[in-house]
Every structure is written in C-alpha cells, then in structure tokens.
C-alpha cells in the first residue's frame, strides 16, 4: 500500500473549502489513506455516494457504524497522481451539486490545486 500524505492534505483542503468537516476531530487523527467527510446534520451522505457512482463513475466509501449516513469517505492511497485526485474531487463536487449541497462549485478542486502547486517540485524530463 502506498500512502500519500500530500494527496491527503489536498483532499482535506478541498473539504475545508466546501465548508464541510473532517470526521477526525484533531489533525493528529487524520489518515493518510482516507478522509471521512461529515455532511450537514439531517442530510444523508449516502445520497452523495450514490450520485457520484451512478452519475459520474466515482466510487466513494460509506460511513460505518455510528457515522453511517453522516459521512462519505474519499480514498487517497495507492498509485495516484494529482490529476487523478482532482478528477475524483470534481466528481464529488458534481454529485454534491446534484444532491443540493450548499457549497461554491469549484472551491474544493481549486483548494486542492493550490495545495498541490504550492508544494510540487517540477518533473525532470528525459530530454533535459
């Protein structure tokens, strides 16, 4: 398993930009493999999960146990790159828009882009 803490922080930046919460209440509890996004009270997070999958082909995890229906999970581990994470975040934004979640469209993707470009080292090209 490849854990990507930098990708995780980009996802957390998106969650903050959406005005939603992280299920982990302290940063010391944040995971480098998955972020559980807390939706507004009374809203069923499973609606977002279903819309993301059926409308955009994006697979999100469901909340389990006490957080069932209260969170959706975004994974950020394995063979990923920044565009793949941004694509997933875009799919989440589309699904949230479909479900009537109140947020500024593009805010999460934009926050992740800012995070990734602020910390990225340029790739060395073979021709250089």
PLM features per residue range, with description:
Residues 1-23, 51:
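Conserved PLP-dependent catalytic core of the aminotransferase class-I/II
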Residues 3-11, 31, 44, 48, ...:
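General structural feature for long, well-ordered alpha-helical segments within catalytic domains
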Residues 20, 57-58, 101:
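Short aromatic/hydrophobic-glycine micro-motifs
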Residues 21-55:
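Conserved PLP-binding catalytic core of the aspartate aminotransferase-like
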Residues 24, 60-62:
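General beta-strand structural signal in soluble alpha/beta enzymes
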Residues 52-60, 94-96:
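A common structural junction motif
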Residues 66, 70-128:
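PLP-dependent enzyme catalytic core of the Aspartate aminotransferase-like
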